[in-house]
Swiss-Prot record:
Enzyme Commission (EC) number: 4.2.1.24
Top-level EC class: lyase
Positions that bind Mg(2+): E231
Residues the record lists as binding 5-aminolevulinate 2: S272, Y311
Function: Catalyzes an early step in the biosynthesis of tetrapyrroles. Binds two molecules of 5-aminolevulinate per subunit, each at a distinct site, and catalyzes their condensation to form porphobilinogen.
Catalytic residues, chain numbering: K193 (schiff-base intermediate with substrate), K246 (schiff-base intermediate with substrate)
Protein name per its UniProtKB record: Delta-aminolevulinic acid dehydratase
Cofactor note text: Binds 1 zinc ion per monomer.
GO terms, molecular function: porphobilinogen synthase activity; zinc ion binding
Pfam families: ALAD
Any one GO cellular component localisation term in the record: cytosol
Amino acid sequence: MFKRLRRLRSSENLRAMVRETRLNINDFIAPLFVIESDSGIKNEISSMPGVYQMSIEPLLKECEELVGLGIKAVLLFGIPKHKDATGSHALNKDHIVAKATREIKKRFKDLIVIADLCFCEYTDHGHCGILENASVSNDKTLKILNLQGLILAESGVDILAPSNMMDGNVLSLRKALDKAGYFHTPIMSYSTKFASSYYGPFRDVANSPPSFGDRKSYQMDYANQKEALLESLEDEKQGADILMVKPALAYLDIVKEIRDHTLLPLALYNVSGEYAMLKLAQKHNLINYESVLLETMTCFKRAGADMIISYHAKEVANLLQRN
Protein backbone atom coordinates (compact mmCIF):
# COMPACT_ATOMS: atom_id res chain seq x y z
CA MET A 1 0.00 0.00 0.00
CA PHE A 2 1.30 3.47 -0.84
CA LYS A 3 -0.02 6.92 -0.05
CA ARG A 4 -1.76 8.70 -2.95
CA LEU A 5 -0.49 12.19 -2.26
CA ARG A 6 -1.82 13.42 -5.61
CA ARG A 7 -5.38 13.27 -4.25
CA LEU A 8 -4.97 16.72 -2.70
CA ARG A 9 -3.55 18.22 -5.90
CA SER A 10 -6.42 17.43 -8.23
CA SER A 11 -7.92 20.95 -8.53
CA GLU A 12 -6.85 24.55 -8.00
CA ASN A 13 -9.36 25.03 -5.18
CA LEU A 14 -8.22 21.87 -3.42
CA ARG A 15 -4.57 22.84 -3.75
CA ALA A 16 -5.40 26.27 -2.34
CA MET A 17 -7.28 24.74 0.58
CA VAL A 18 -4.30 22.66 1.75
CA ARG A 19 -1.59 25.18 0.89
CA GLU A 20 0.82 25.56 3.80
CA THR A 21 2.39 28.92 2.95
CA ARG A 22 0.39 31.98 1.90
CA LEU A 23 1.50 35.44 0.85
CA ASN A 24 -0.21 38.48 2.35
CA ILE A 25 0.21 42.15 1.53
CA ASN A 26 1.06 42.68 5.22
CA ASP A 27 4.24 40.64 4.69
CA PHE A 28 5.87 43.30 2.51
CA ILE A 29 8.06 46.32 3.20
CA ALA A 30 8.86 48.66 0.30
CA PRO A 31 12.37 50.20 0.18
CA LEU A 32 12.39 53.83 -1.01
CA PHE A 33 15.27 56.16 -1.86
CA VAL A 34 14.82 59.83 -1.03
CA ILE A 35 17.24 62.30 -2.58
CA GLU A 36 17.97 65.78 -1.28
CA SER A 37 16.73 68.30 -3.86
CA ASP A 38 14.87 71.59 -4.07
CA SER A 39 12.94 70.46 -7.16
CA GLY A 40 10.73 67.48 -7.90
CA ILE A 41 13.09 64.67 -8.91
CA LYS A 42 12.20 61.11 -9.86
CA ASN A 43 15.17 59.38 -11.49
CA GLU A 44 14.75 55.79 -12.64
CA ILE A 45 17.83 53.63 -12.07
CA SER A 46 18.95 51.90 -15.26
CA SER A 47 20.19 48.79 -13.45
CA MET A 48 16.91 48.54 -11.48
CA PRO A 49 13.96 49.36 -13.77
CA GLY A 50 10.98 50.51 -11.74
CA VAL A 51 13.15 51.77 -8.86
CA TYR A 52 13.69 55.51 -8.43
CA GLN A 53 15.63 58.16 -6.59
CA MET A 54 12.89 60.56 -5.46
CA SER A 55 12.78 63.95 -3.83
CA ILE A 56 10.18 64.43 -1.12
CA GLU A 57 7.11 65.32 -3.23
CA PRO A 58 7.40 62.32 -5.60
CA LEU A 59 8.17 60.19 -2.54
CA LEU A 60 4.88 61.23 -0.95
CA LYS A 61 3.01 60.30 -4.14
CA GLU A 62 4.71 56.91 -4.07
CA CYS A 63 3.68 56.44 -0.44
CA GLU A 64 0.09 57.32 -1.37
CA GLU A 65 0.12 54.61 -4.03
CA LEU A 66 1.64 52.06 -1.65
CA VAL A 67 -0.93 52.83 1.05
CA GLY A 68 -3.69 52.44 -1.54
CA LEU A 69 -2.38 48.97 -2.35
CA GLY A 70 -2.43 47.98 1.32
CA ILE A 71 1.32 48.11 1.98
CA LYS A 72 1.83 49.19 5.56
CA ALA A 73 5.59 49.81 5.84
CA VAL A 74 8.41 51.51 3.95
CA LEU A 75 12.17 51.41 4.48
CA LEU A 76 13.86 54.76 3.80
CA PHE A 77 17.36 55.35 2.46
CA GLY A 78 18.75 58.87 2.15
CA ILE A 79 20.85 60.36 -0.64
CA PRO A 80 22.30 63.73 0.42
CA LYS A 81 23.77 66.51 -1.69
CA HIS A 82 26.81 66.78 0.54
CA LYS A 83 29.08 63.90 1.56
CA ASP A 84 32.20 64.05 3.71
CA ALA A 85 34.59 61.78 5.59
CA THR A 86 32.38 61.47 8.67
CA GLY A 87 28.93 61.48 7.05
CA SER A 88 28.06 64.67 8.92
CA HIS A 89 24.82 65.21 6.96
CA ALA A 90 23.33 62.23 8.81
CA LEU A 91 23.94 64.03 12.12
CA ASN A 92 21.91 67.08 11.06
CA LYS A 93 18.37 67.26 12.44
CA ASP A 94 17.16 68.34 9.01
CA HIS A 95 18.88 65.59 7.08
CA ILE A 96 16.96 64.12 4.19
CA VAL A 97 15.49 61.02 5.88
CA ALA A 98 14.42 63.01 8.94
CA LYS A 99 12.70 65.60 6.73
CA ALA A 100 11.04 62.91 4.61
CA THR A 101 9.81 61.10 7.71
CA ARG A 102 8.18 64.22 9.09
CA GLU A 103 6.40 64.84 5.78
CA ILE A 104 5.26 61.22 5.48
CA LYS A 105 3.87 61.26 9.01
CA LYS A 106 1.88 64.44 8.31
CA ARG A 107 0.00 62.73 5.47
CA PHE A 108 0.13 59.02 6.30
CA LYS A 109 0.31 58.74 10.08
CA ASP A 110 -0.39 54.99 10.07
CA LEU A 111 2.28 54.11 7.50
CA ILE A 112 5.19 52.47 9.32
CA VAL A 113 8.43 54.28 8.54
CA ILE A 114 11.59 52.22 8.99
CA ALA A 115 14.88 54.09 8.63
CA ASP A 116 18.07 52.44 7.47
CA LEU A 117 20.73 53.41 10.00
CA CYS A 118 24.15 53.54 8.37
CA PHE A 119 26.72 55.97 6.98
CA CYS A 120 27.69 54.55 3.58
CA GLU A 121 25.23 56.86 1.76
CA TYR A 122 26.61 59.90 3.63
CA THR A 123 30.40 59.40 3.53
CA ASP A 124 32.57 60.45 0.60
CA HIS A 125 34.49 57.18 0.90
CA GLY A 126 31.38 54.97 0.81
CA HIS A 127 32.25 52.97 3.92
CA CYS A 128 29.83 52.50 6.80
CA GLY A 129 31.50 54.60 9.47
CA ILE A 130 34.52 56.58 10.59
CA LEU A 131 37.81 55.58 9.00
CA GLU A 132 40.94 55.04 11.04
CA ASN A 133 44.10 53.80 9.30
CA ALA A 134 42.06 52.86 6.20
CA SER A 135 39.70 50.70 8.29
CA VAL A 136 36.29 51.42 9.81
CA SER A 137 36.65 52.16 13.52
CA ASN A 138 34.03 50.04 15.27
CA ASP A 139 33.62 51.97 18.52
CA LYS A 140 33.90 55.48 17.07
CA THR A 141 31.25 54.52 14.51
CA LEU A 142 28.92 53.31 17.28
CA LYS A 143 28.91 56.78 18.81
CA ILE A 144 27.80 58.54 15.63
CA LEU A 145 25.30 55.77 14.83
CA ASN A 146 23.65 56.47 18.17
CA LEU A 147 23.43 60.18 17.31
CA GLN A 148 21.93 59.42 13.91
CA GLY A 149 19.45 57.03 15.52
CA LEU A 150 18.31 59.64 18.05
CA ILE A 151 17.77 62.24 15.31
CA LEU A 152 15.66 59.77 13.33
CA ALA A 153 13.67 58.70 16.38
CA GLU A 154 12.94 62.36 17.15
CA SER A 155 11.76 62.89 13.55
CA GLY A 156 9.06 60.25 14.02
CA VAL A 157 10.64 57.11 12.56
CA ASP A 158 8.73 54.06 13.81
CA ILE A 159 11.56 51.50 13.56
CA LEU A 160 15.34 51.91 13.37
CA ALA A 161 17.23 49.45 11.19
CA PRO A 162 21.01 49.50 11.84
CA SER A 163 22.70 47.98 8.79
CA ASN A 164 26.34 48.80 9.48
CA MET A 165 27.43 45.43 10.94
CA MET A 166 29.49 47.04 13.70
CA ASP A 167 29.98 44.79 16.73
CA GLY A 168 27.77 45.88 19.62
CA ASN A 169 25.63 48.22 17.53
CA VAL A 170 22.28 46.95 18.81
CA LEU A 171 23.18 47.20 22.50
CA SER A 172 24.75 50.62 22.01
CA LEU A 173 21.71 51.93 20.13
CA ARG A 174 19.23 50.41 22.60
CA LYS A 175 20.97 52.09 25.52
CA ALA A 176 21.04 55.44 23.72
CA LEU A 177 17.35 55.23 22.79
CA ASP A 178 16.28 54.23 26.29
CA LYS A 179 18.37 56.97 27.91
CA ALA A 180 16.64 59.53 25.66
CA GLY A 181 13.19 58.14 26.49
CA TYR A 182 12.56 56.23 23.26
CA PHE A 183 11.73 53.00 25.07
CA HIS A 184 9.10 52.04 22.53
CA THR A 185 11.17 52.50 19.36
CA PRO A 186 11.92 49.00 18.02
CA ILE A 187 15.22 47.95 16.46
CA MET A 188 15.13 45.89 13.27
CA SER A 189 18.72 44.70 13.10
CA TYR A 190 20.43 43.71 9.87
CA SER A 191 21.66 40.94 12.10
CA THR A 192 23.01 38.56 9.45
CA LYS A 193 24.21 40.67 6.54
CA PHE A 194 26.63 39.10 4.12
CA ALA A 195 29.36 40.76 2.04
CA SER A 196 27.59 39.96 -1.20
CA SER A 197 28.01 40.71 -4.88
CA TYR A 198 24.20 40.70 -5.11
CA TYR A 199 24.26 44.28 -3.80
CA GLY A 200 25.74 45.73 -7.00
CA PRO A 201 22.74 47.68 -8.38
CA PHE A 202 21.93 49.11 -4.92
CA ARG A 203 25.14 51.08 -5.02
CA ASP A 204 23.92 52.73 -8.24
CA VAL A 205 20.68 53.91 -6.67
CA ALA A 206 22.19 54.90 -3.30
CA ASN A 207 25.33 56.45 -4.84
CA SER A 208 27.37 54.56 -2.25
CA PRO A 209 30.10 52.33 -3.74
CA PRO A 210 33.24 52.15 -1.55
CA SER A 211 35.93 54.44 -2.96
CA PHE A 212 38.54 51.85 -2.02
CA GLY A 213 38.58 48.23 -0.89
CA ASP A 214 35.37 46.47 0.10
CA ARG A 215 33.20 45.84 3.16
CA LYS A 216 34.39 42.32 3.94
CA SER A 217 36.04 43.34 7.22
CA TYR A 218 32.63 44.09 8.75
CA GLN A 219 30.00 42.35 6.61
CA MET A 220 29.83 38.56 6.86
CA ASP A 221 31.64 35.90 4.83
CA TYR A 222 28.97 34.20 2.68
CA ALA A 223 30.66 30.82 3.26
CA ASN A 224 29.83 30.76 6.99
CA GLN A 225 26.62 29.25 8.36
CA LYS A 226 27.50 28.94 12.06
CA GLU A 227 28.74 32.52 12.22
CA ALA A 228 25.54 33.65 10.48
CA LEU A 229 23.49 32.11 13.28
CA LEU A 230 25.83 33.53 15.92
CA GLU A 231 25.45 37.06 14.54
CA SER A 232 21.65 36.98 14.78
CA LEU A 233 21.53 35.33 18.19
CA GLU A 234 24.04 37.89 19.50
CA ASP A 235 21.83 40.74 18.27
CA GLU A 236 18.85 39.10 19.95
CA LYS A 237 20.78 39.09 23.25
CA GLN A 238 21.67 42.76 22.76
CA GLY A 239 18.00 43.72 22.45
CA ALA A 240 17.01 43.53 18.79
CA ASP A 241 13.24 43.35 18.30
CA ILE A 242 13.39 42.03 14.72
CA LEU A 243 16.20 40.07 13.06
CA MET A 244 17.12 40.06 9.37
CA VAL A 245 18.92 38.04 6.73
CA LYS A 246 20.38 39.86 3.71
CA PRO A 247 20.53 38.85 0.82
CA ALA A 248 17.66 36.41 0.34
CA LEU A 249 17.66 34.10 -2.66
CA ALA A 250 20.95 32.26 -2.12
CA TYR A 251 20.60 32.30 1.68
CA LEU A 252 17.37 30.45 2.45
CA ASP A 253 19.32 27.82 4.39
CA ILE A 254 20.43 30.64 6.70
CA VAL A 255 16.85 31.90 7.06
CA LYS A 256 15.72 28.41 8.08
CA GLU A 257 18.60 28.00 10.53
CA ILE A 258 17.86 31.30 12.27
CA ARG A 259 14.11 30.67 12.21
CA ASP A 260 14.70 27.39 14.07
CA HIS A 261 16.70 29.15 16.81
CA THR A 262 14.69 32.29 17.60
CA LEU A 263 11.16 33.33 18.44
CA LEU A 264 11.75 36.90 17.26
CA PRO A 265 10.18 38.13 14.02
CA LEU A 266 12.52 37.51 11.10
CA ALA A 267 12.82 39.81 8.09
CA LEU A 268 14.45 38.93 4.79
CA TYR A 269 15.88 41.47 2.34
CA ASN A 270 15.27 40.59 -1.31
CA VAL A 271 18.18 42.67 -2.61
CA SER A 272 18.90 44.71 -5.72
CA GLY A 273 20.84 42.06 -7.65
CA GLU A 274 18.06 39.53 -7.14
CA TYR A 275 15.53 42.11 -8.32
CA ALA A 276 17.65 43.02 -11.37
CA MET A 277 18.00 39.38 -12.44
CA LEU A 278 14.24 38.83 -12.51
CA LYS A 279 13.70 42.12 -14.31
CA LEU A 280 16.27 41.20 -16.97
CA ALA A 281 14.65 37.80 -17.45
CA GLN A 282 11.27 39.54 -17.81
CA LYS A 283 12.65 41.97 -20.39
CA HIS A 284 13.93 39.12 -22.58
CA ASN A 285 10.80 36.95 -22.10
CA LEU A 286 12.86 34.16 -20.57
CA ILE A 287 10.34 33.34 -17.83
CA ASN A 288 6.71 33.72 -16.86
CA TYR A 289 7.61 36.75 -14.76
CA GLU A 290 4.52 36.99 -12.55
CA SER A 291 4.55 33.28 -11.81
CA VAL A 292 8.26 33.26 -10.94
CA LEU A 293 7.83 36.38 -8.81
CA LEU A 294 5.07 34.84 -6.68
CA GLU A 295 6.96 31.55 -6.44
CA THR A 296 10.07 33.35 -5.22
CA MET A 297 8.20 35.35 -2.58
CA THR A 298 6.33 32.27 -1.37
CA CYS A 299 9.61 30.40 -0.97
CA PHE A 300 10.98 33.24 1.15
CA LYS A 301 8.05 32.79 3.53
CA ARG A 302 8.27 29.01 3.42
CA ALA A 303 11.90 29.23 4.58
CA GLY A 304 10.76 31.13 7.67
CA ALA A 305 10.61 34.85 6.86
CA ASP A 306 7.87 36.79 8.64
CA MET A 307 8.37 39.90 6.52
CA ILE A 308 9.95 40.56 3.14
CA ILE A 309 11.75 43.76 2.19
CA SER A 310 11.53 43.84 -1.59
CA TYR A 311 11.70 46.22 -4.55
CA HIS A 312 8.94 44.00 -5.97
CA ALA A 313 6.58 44.96 -3.12
CA LYS A 314 4.27 47.12 -5.24
CA GLU A 315 4.11 44.54 -8.04
CA VAL A 316 3.34 41.76 -5.58
CA ALA A 317 0.61 43.84 -3.94
CA ASN A 318 -1.01 44.37 -7.34
CA LEU A 319 -0.81 40.65 -8.09
CA LEU A 320 -2.30 39.69 -4.74
CA GLN A 321 -5.18 42.11 -5.24
CA ARG A 322 -5.89 40.60 -8.67
CA ASN A 323 -5.74 37.05 -7.37
